[in-house]
């Protein structure tokens, strides 16, 4: 089985390289690949990659994820998040391939306090959400064999993440202010990759699982409580911090070009039932990531 992975060097793409390898022959690209086009600013190029390789499975971990930047470059965000996804969907349909694609809770308006269902009405607050929703719709229209996983608050041990930023600031400052009115579940790239690999195996044997799913860790937190956990674990590990006061503030304290949803909770019952998996609490993955961070690198 040939598996084509786009976006191999991103947070999720990096973990997918590990998780997908046992499933078959993994062919992975990113924007800099030269043998074939992996650059999503070239829709026809990535479609030609699909037609040339003729994979059984396509996993798309490439996206324009700079939420604030998307507000000032909506055409580019649309090109990456929707136009190229449509091109891949059409090419995948031609060669009979499955497409696994990642989307976001930002397709929702972010109000209320109930976890969003796959069937809830969408109403994006920003350009990023609009373009990701357009990508979803294109894939649904042009390639029946698809799995779309909406996720949120994604982190990974590789590269920058919220926890690393908080730890750096807590070493430099005695007081920090963190938002406490946005709710979601920090979800590890490791978890997304492992769930994706399992879902692919299920889909190959049960094609009727094709469709849209919500995929995040269990439980709910705020950025403030997330930060508090990071600092608690750091102190347990003997990491010296200058911080002595953590303040909770509303979203309005940090104005940004793109509006953020207050409610990023996603209901994952459909995913857990269809793929016979249990999604662990968000703290499990975060504590594991922090433990690796504390024991393998200088923060």
UniProtKB/Swiss-Prot annotation:
Q: Which reaction does it catalyse?
A: dTDP-beta-L-rhamnose + NADP(+) = dTDP-4-dehydro-beta-L-rhamnose + NADPH + H(+)
Q: Which UniProt keywords apply?
A: Carbohydrate metabolism, Lipopolysaccharide biosynthesis, Magnesium, Metal-binding, NAD, NADP, Oxidoreductase
Q: How is the cofactor bound?
A: Binds 1 Mg(2+) ion per monomer.
Which CDD domains does the record associate with it?
A: dTDP_HR_like_SDR_e
What residues make up the catalytic site?
Answer: 128 (proton donor/acceptor)
Q: Where is this site: Could provide a fine-tuning to achieve optimal pKa matching between active site and substrate?
A: 104
Pathway participation: Carbohydrate biosynthesis; dTDP-L-rhamnose biosynthesis; Bacterial outer membrane biogenesis; LPS O-antigen biosynthesis
Q: Where does dTDP-beta-L-rhamnose bind?
A: 104-105, 153
Cofactor(s) the record lists:
Mg(2+)
Might you name a Gene Ontology BP term for this protein?
A: dTDP-rhamnose biosynthetic process
Highest taxon of the lineage = Bacteria
What are the transmembrane regions?
none
* Residue numbers binding NADH: 10-12, 30, 39-40, 63-65, 128, 132
Q: Name one GO cellular component term.
A: cytosol
Question: What GO MF annotations does this protein's record show?
Answer: dTDP-4-dehydrorhamnose reductase activity; metal ion binding
Question: What EC number(s) is this enzyme filed under?
Answer: 1.1.1.133
Residues annotated to bind NADPH = 11-12, 39-40, 63-65, 102, 128, 132
Q: What does this protein do?
A: Involved in the biosynthesis of the dTDP-L-rhamnose which is an important component of lipopolysaccharide (LPS). Catalyzes the reduction of dTDP-6-deoxy-L-lyxo-4-hexulose to yield dTDP-L-rhamnose. RmlD uses NADH and NADPH nearly equally well.
Subunit note? Homodimer.
Q: Which family does it belong to?
A: Belongs to the dTDP-4-dehydrorhamnose reductase family.
Task: Give the protein's recorded name.
Answer: dTDP-4-dehydrorhamnose reductase
Organism annotation: Escherichia coli (strain K12)
């Amino acid at each position: 089985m040939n598996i084509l992975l786009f976006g191999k060097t991103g947070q999720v793409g990096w973990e997918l390289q590990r998780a997908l390898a046992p499933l078959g022959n993994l062919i992975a690209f990113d924007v800099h690949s030269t043998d074939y086009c992996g650059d999503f600013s070239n829709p026809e190029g990535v479609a030609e990659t699909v037609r040339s390789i003729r994979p059984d499975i396509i996993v798309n971990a490439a996206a324009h994820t700079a939420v604030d930047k998307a507000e000032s470059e909506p055409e580019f965000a649309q090109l990456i998040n929707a136009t190229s996804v449509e091109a891949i969907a059409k090419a995948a349909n031609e060669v009979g391939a499955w497409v696994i694609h990642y989307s976001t809770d930002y397709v929702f308006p972010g109000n209320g306090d109930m976890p969003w269902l796959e069937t809830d009405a969408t109403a994006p607050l920003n350009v990023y959400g609009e373009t990701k929703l357009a990508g979803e719709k294109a894939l649904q229209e042009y390639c029946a064999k698809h799995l779309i996983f909406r996720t949120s608050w994604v982190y990974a041990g590789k590269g920058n993440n919220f926890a690393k930023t908080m730890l750096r600031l807590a070493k430099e400052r005695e007081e920090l202010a963190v938002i406490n009115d946005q709710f979601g579940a920090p979800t590890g790239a490791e978890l997304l990759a492992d769930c994706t690999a399992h879902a692919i195996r299920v889909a190959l044997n049960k094609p009727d699982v094709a469709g849209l799913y919500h995929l995040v860790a269990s439980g709910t937190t705020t950025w403030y409580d997330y930060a508090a956990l990071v600092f608690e674990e750091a102190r347990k590990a003997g990491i010296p911090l200058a911080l002595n006061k953590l303040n909770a503030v509303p979203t309005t304290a940090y104005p940004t070009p793109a509006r953020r949803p207050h409610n990023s909770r996603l209901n994952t019952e459909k995913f857990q039932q269809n793929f016979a998996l249990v999604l662990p609490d968000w703290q499990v993955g975060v504590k594991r990531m922090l433990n690796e961070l504390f024991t393998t690198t200088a923060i």
